C-alpha cells in the first residue's frame, strides 16, 4: 500500500494516517489535488483510530453538530457505494434524569432539526420501546435520533486510504515526522526519519504527538493539547443475545454511554468528572496498536452507572477494559485550521475523543480551506488562533485536561460554567479589590474578569466555581439588575482590561494608508478622534470589529475584542507592508481599562480629573491626569452605547485611579459592575459583538452597520464584495426580537443559538439574548433571512414570538 521512497517535493504533506488524516487526504483528492503525501510513523490507523468506541452522534451544539452531520452523510454515502466501513445506522437514545437535561436535549434537537436531522422526543414510558434494557423510573424523558450510528474506525481508515491512493495520493508508513521547517513565516518543508520533503502546504494530524513535533520545529509553534486516560469496557456475551436494532444509549447525567458490540456484547464507556493525564513529560516515540494498563478503580463508576441504568444486565460481567490515551484541548473544542505562527501549516488535532464522529466533516472542511484559501465561518470556535502562549504551558495543560474530559457531559449553554482548574493566570491589578467586593469572576483568554457582584451575603463555592447556567431566569439576575440600574440612573464602573490592545505606527504617514486599506470606515481623521470600524475580508465579512484611535499623525491605538488577541494580531501582521514601514505592537497588558457608565459619569470624572469634559465629545479622546496618575486616555466611547467613558489607565496607576473614582463616586451612587450587566446593556441597545453576531461571513450591511462603511474610499479590503451586496440585496440580516407571550420569570429564555422558524421552515438563528430591564421582556439578536412575518423560537415547553 505504501510508497518505499519519499518524494523530494510535494504540494501537500499530511502527517498522520489516522481517521482524520485519511479523511483530509481523501477529500483533497476529491477536490482535484493529487500531489499529496501522507506520512505515518507506524501503520495506518495505529494510533487512536484502532481503539475508537465507534460513536457518531449528531445531538451536539454549533460546529460539533455541523461536523457530525457531515460525517453521517459521508459515511452513509461510502456504505451505499459498496465500501465496507462498518456503518451501522442504529440511532441514539439520549435520556434525561432532570428537567434541565431534558430542556438541553430539546434545544439541541431544535438545532439538529435546522440541520436536517430527524429527532423524536420521547416520554419516559416510551423509552423502553426504543431500548428494552433501560430503567425509566428516574428519567423525565429523552430524544431519539434515528440517523446516528456506529462506524468501524479501522475499516474507515483503510477505505479512505485506499480511495485516496486510487486518486493519486502517496502513502509512506514507518516514517517519523521530526520537525516542520518554515521560512519567512510560511511552511516550506518537513524533516522526517527518511529525509526532507519540500512542500507548499502541511497538515499536522498527529494526535498526541503533535506538541512534540511543534516543539522540535524550526521555528516552533503552539499546539495546546494533552493526553488523558480514557477507558471503555466490553462485556461478556448476553445469553439471550441483543436486538440488532438496539440504539446507542447516552446517559450524560450518569457520564455513561453503551452500545451493542458484535452480536451479544455491550461496549460501555464514559467521561470521568476528574480525568487522569498521561505522558506528562514525554510522549512515547512508539505507541503502535498499544493500550495503557487498565485502571479498574477509575472505570468502576462508569460500569456502575451502566448497571444502574440497565438493571436487567447487572449480572453481565466484564470481559475486558480497554484504556488508552486520548488527546484533549484546554477548552474542550477541537483544533482545526492554520497555525497562528506559520502560514500554510494546518492543524487537525485535539478531537477530544471524537475522531470518528468528526472525521468526515473535518476532512471536508479543511480540504475546502486549503484549496479555497479561507475557512468557513462556522469553524471559528475551532480556530487555532483562539489561543495565546499560556494555553501551551505544560503545567496549565496537565491541570486543565483533568477537567476537560468531563465537560463532554455538561449541558451546553452559551454561558458555559467557568473552568475551575488553571485559573488566576492573567489578572488586572484591580482583581483583589474586586474580589473583596464579592466579584464572581470568569475567564476569557486566561484573563480573570468580574461577571457580577454578589452583594449581601456571598454564596460559598469551591475554587472559582460559578453557578450552573440556567436556561431560564439565572440565579444572579437580581445582582445584575442592581448593576444595570446603577448604569442607567447613576454611575457604574467596570474593569474591562481584557480587551486586546495594539499600537500601529510608522515613521511617516504610511500607517494611515495601511489602515485605510484594512478598515472599511474612514480612519484618516484628525488626531484625537475615535473611529469604530470593521476590518473585512475579500468577501466583505468581518475579520475584526474594533475601534482605532488616532493618537498622533503617524500612530493609532487599536482596541479589539478579548478573543481576538492572537487572531487579529496575526491577521494584521500578514498584511503589513513588506518594507517594514508600519509596525504593530501588542500592548494588551500595558493598560487597565475602566468603563465609567451612566448619566452621572461626566460629573464623577470632572470631579476626579479636575477637568471640564464638555469639550470631550463622543468619538473623541483626551490624555489627562486623574488624581496623581498621568497619561490616562479618556475615550468618549464605550461599546454599550450608554452615556459614559472608557479610561485606558497605565497599569501601574490602576489601583490609585480606581480607588479615587470609587471614593469620589460615593456622592454619585457609584457601583461596581460586571460583564453580564454590560452584555445585557449592549443586547438591549442592539449592539452586535464579535463571535456572536459578527464573524467572517457576516458583512456590515447585514449587521446594520452600513454607516461604518465608506464605499466612497478609493479602496479597502472587501469593498467590491460590499458594493456588489449593496446592489444585489441581502441574503440575511441582523434583527432584534422582543419575545411575546413569554414569562421571563418562569419560562426558558433565548440565550443564543436557538433556531428561528417561519411556517415550520428554518429561517435564522438567535445569536445572543438576555433580559431588557427597561423594556421588561426577554430580548435577543437574530441572524435571519430578510423577510417579515410571525416567527417562532422553540424555547420549550413553549414556542414564543
Q: What is the meaning of each model-derived region?
A:
Residues 74-77, 83, 97-174, 178-186, ...:
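Flavin (FAD/FMN) cofactor-binding and adjacent substrate-gating region
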Residues 253, 285-425:
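C-terminal catalytic lobe of FAD-dependent flavoproteins
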Residues 3-20, 37:
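Beta1/beta-strand and adjacent pyrophosphate-binding region of the FAD-binding site
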Residues 23, 57, 179-294, 300-314, ...:
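Flavin-dependent oxidoreductases
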Residues 53-130, 253-258, 263-265, 286, ...:
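Dinucleotide-binding Rossmann-like beta1-alpha1 core, especially the glycine-rich loop
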Residues 17-18, 22, 41, 206:
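Glycine-rich Rossmann-fold phosphate-binding loop(s) that bind the pyrophosphate
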Residues 29-50:
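Glycine-rich FAD pyrophosphate-binding loop
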Residues 387-801:
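Glycine/proline-enriched, intrinsically flexible loops and inter-domain linkers
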Amino acid at each position: 500500500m505504501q510508497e518505499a521512497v519519499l518524494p523530494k517535493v510535494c504540494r501537500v504533506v499530511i502527517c498522520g494516517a489516522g481517521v482524520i488524516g485519511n479523511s483530509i487526504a481523501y477529500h483533497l483528492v476529491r477536490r482535484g489535488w493529487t500531489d499529496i503525501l501522507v506520512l505515518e510513523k507506524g501503520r495506518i490507523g495505529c494510533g487512536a483510530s484502532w481503539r475508537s468506541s465507534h460513536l457518531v452522534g449528531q445531538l451536539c451544539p454549533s460546529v460539533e453538530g455541523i461536523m457530525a452531520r457531515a460525517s453521517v452523510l459521508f459515511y452513509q454515502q461510502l456504505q451505499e457505494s459498496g465500501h465496507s466501513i462498518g456503518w451501522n445506522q442504529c440511532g441514539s437514545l439520549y435520556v434525561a434524569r432532570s428537567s434541565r437535561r431534558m430542556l438541553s436535549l430539546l434545544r439541541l434537537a431544535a438545532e439538529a432539526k435546522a440541520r436536517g436531522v430527524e429527532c423524536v422526543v420521547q416520554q419516559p414510558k416510551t423509552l423502553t420501546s426504543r431500548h428494552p434494557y433501560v430503567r425509566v423510573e428516574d428519567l423525565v424523558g429523552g430524544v431519539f435520533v434515528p440517523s446516528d450510528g456506529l462506524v468501524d474506525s479501522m475499516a474507515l481508515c483503510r477505505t479512505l486510504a485506499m480511495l485516496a491512493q486510487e486518486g493519486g495520493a502517496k502513502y509512506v508508513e514507518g516514517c517519523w515526522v521530526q520537525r516542520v521547517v518554515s521560512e519567512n513565516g510560511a511552511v516550506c518543508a518537513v524533516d522526517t526519519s527518511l529525509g526532507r520533503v519540500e512542500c507548499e502546504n502541511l497538515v499536522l494530524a498527529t494526535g498526541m504527538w503533535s506538541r512534540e513535533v511543534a516543539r522540535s520545529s524550526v521555528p516552533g509553534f503552539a499546539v495546546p493539547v494533552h493526553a488523558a486516560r480514557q477507558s471503555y469496557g466490553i462485556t461478556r456475551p448476553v445469553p439471550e443475545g441483543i436486538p440488532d436494532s438496539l440504539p446507542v444509549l447516552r446517559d450524560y447525567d450518569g457520564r455513561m454511554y453503551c452500545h451493542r458490540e458484535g452480536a451479544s456484547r455491550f461496549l460501555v464507556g464514559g467521561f470521568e468528572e476528574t480525568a487522569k493525564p498521561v505522558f506528562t513529560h514525554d510522549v512515547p516515540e512508539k505507541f503502535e496498536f498499544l493500550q495503557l494498563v487498565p485502571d479498574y478503580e477509575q472505570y468502576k463508576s462508569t460500569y456502575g452507572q451502566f448497571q444502574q441504568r440497565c438493571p436487567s444486565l447487572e449480572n453481565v460481567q466484564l470481559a475486558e477494559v480497554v484504556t488508552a490515551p486520548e488527546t484533549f484541548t484546554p477548552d474542550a473544542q477541537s483544533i482545526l485550521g492554520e497555525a497562528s505562527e506559520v502560514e500554510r501549516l494546518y492543524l487537525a488535532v485535539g478531537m477530544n475523543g471524537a475522531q470518528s464522529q468528526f472525521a468526515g466533516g473535518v476532512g471536508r472542511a479543511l480540504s475546502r480551506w486549503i484549496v479555497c484559501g479561507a475557512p468557513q465561518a462556522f469553524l471559528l470556535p475551532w480556530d487555532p488562533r483562539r489561543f495565546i502562549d499560556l494555553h501551551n504551558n505544560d503545567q496549565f495543560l496537565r491541570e486543565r485536561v483533568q477537567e476537560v474530559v468531563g465537560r463532554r457531559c455538561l449541558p451546553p449553554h452559551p454561558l458555559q460554567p467557568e473552568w475551575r482548574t488553571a485559573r488566576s493566570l492573567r489578572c488586572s491589578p484591580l482583581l483583589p479589590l474586586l474580589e473583596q467586593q464579592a466579584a464572581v469572576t470568569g475567564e476569557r483568554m486566561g484573563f480573570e474578569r468580574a461577571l457580577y457582584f454578589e452583594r449581601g451575603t456571598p454564596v460559598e463555592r469551591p475554587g472559582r466555581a460559578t453557578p450552573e447556567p440556567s436556561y431560564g431566569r439565572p440565579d444572579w439576575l437580581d445582582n445584575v439588575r442592581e448593576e444595570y440600574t446603577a448604569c442607567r440612573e447613576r454611575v457604574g464602573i467596570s474593569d474591562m482590561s481584557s480587551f486586546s490592545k495594539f499600537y500601529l505606527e510608522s515613521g511617516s504617514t504610511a500607517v494611515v494608508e495601511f489602515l485605510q486599506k484594512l478598515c472599511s470606515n474612514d480612519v484618516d481623521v484628525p488626531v484625537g478622534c475615535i473611529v469604530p470600524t470593521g476590518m473585512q475580508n475579500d468577501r466583505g465579512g468581518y475579520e475584526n470589529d474594533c475601534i482605532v484611535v488616532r493618537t498622533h499623525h503617524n500612530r493609532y491605538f487599536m482596541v479589539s475584542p478579548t478573543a481576538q488577541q492572537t487572531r487579529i494580531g496575526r491577521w494584521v501582521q500578514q498584511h503589513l507592508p513588506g518594507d517594514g514601514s508600519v509596525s504593530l505592537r501588542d500592548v494588551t497588558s500595558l493598560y487597565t481599562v475602566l468603563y465609567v457608565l451612566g448619566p452621572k459619569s461626566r460629573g464623577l470624572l470632572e470631579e476626579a480629573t479636575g477637568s471640564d469634559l464638555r469639550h470631550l465629545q463622543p468619538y473623541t479622546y483626551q490624555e489627562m491626569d486623574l488624581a496623581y496618575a498621568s497619561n490616562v486616555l479618556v475615550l468618549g466611547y464605550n461599546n454599550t452605547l450608554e452615556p459614559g467613558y472608557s479610561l485606558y489607565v497605565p497599569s501601574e496607576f490602576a489601583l490609585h485611579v480606581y480607588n479615587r473614582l470609587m471614593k469620589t463616586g460615593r456622592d454619585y451612587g457609584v457601583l461596581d459592575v460586571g460583564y453580564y450587566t454590560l452584555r445585557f446593556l449592549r443586547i438591549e441597545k442592539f449592539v452586535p459583538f464579535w463571535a456572536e453576531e459578527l464573524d467572517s461571513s457576516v458583512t456590515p450591511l447585514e449587521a446594520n452597520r452600513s454607516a461604518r462603511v465608506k464605499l466612497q474610499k478609493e479602496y479597502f479590503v472587501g469593498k467590491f464584495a460590499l458594493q456588489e451586496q449593496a446592489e444585489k440585496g441581502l441574503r440575511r440580516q441582523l434583527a432584534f426580537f422582543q419575545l411575546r407571550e413569554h414569562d421571563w420569570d418562569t419560562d426558558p429564555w433565548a440565550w443564543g443559538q436557538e433556531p428561528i422558524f417561519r411556517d415550520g421552515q428554518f429561517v435564522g438563528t438567535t445569536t445572543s439574548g438576555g433580559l431588557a430591564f427597561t423594556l421588561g421582556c426577554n430580548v435577543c439578536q437574530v441572524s435571519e433571512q430578510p423577510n417579515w412575518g410571525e416567527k417562532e423560537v422553540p424555547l420549550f415547553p413553549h414556542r414564543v414570538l
